[in-house]
Amino acid sequence: MAEKFDNLEEHLEKFVENIRQLGIIVSDFQPSSQAGLNQKLNFLVTGLQDIDKCRQQLHDITVPLEVFDYIDQGRNPQLYTKECLERALAKNEQVKGKIDTLKKFKSLLIQELSKVFPEDMAKYKAIRGEDHPPS
């Protein structure tokens, strides 16, 4: 799988370099540099075709749109992953707290119901396979 990404990365780097060189030629265009411009434009088209071929190899990869927002804002896309993990961790802690609270509530409820309705709770515990009723 990594070789697919390496291949795409290589093609993208070549494409970006080609665009950089094309920008240099265009910014200081001379009629004598027309042949070089045409060559760079052909390389540009070939580069787009190569990138399109890579796209076919990576058709099953999905990227969250928020990653592109990070890139558009000039932020590191790896920060998106870090922030997602931090949000997931915080949500996990929150849910764990709720679960612990509900377990404590269940324990206290069973304890109090056992005081008020000892026979019914003994039957309940027997059905649930929990503590056996006192003899």
From Swiss-Prot:
InterPro entries: Mediator_Med10 (IPR019145). It is found in: Nucleus. GO terms for cellular component: mediator complex. Signal peptide: none annotated. One of its GO terms (biological process) is atrioventricular canal development. Keywords: Activator, Nucleus, Transcription, Transcription regulation. The keyword Nucleus applies. Its main location: nucleus. GO terms for molecular function: transcription coregulator activity. Component of the Mediator complex. PANTHER family: MEDIATOR OF RNA POLYMERASE II TRANSCRIPTION SUBUNIT 10 (PTHR13345:SF13). Belongs to the Mediator complex subunit 10 family. Component of the Mediator complex, a coactivator involved in the regulated transcription of nearly all RNA polymerase II-dependent genes. Mediator functions as a bridge to convey information from gene-specific regulatory proteins to the basal RNA polymerase II transcription machinery. Mediator is recruited to promoters by direct interactions with regulatory proteins and serves as a scaffold for the assembly of a functional preinitiation complex with RNA polymerase II and the general transcription factors. This is Mediator of RNA polymerase II transcription subunit 10. It comes from Xenopus tropicalis (Western clawed frog).
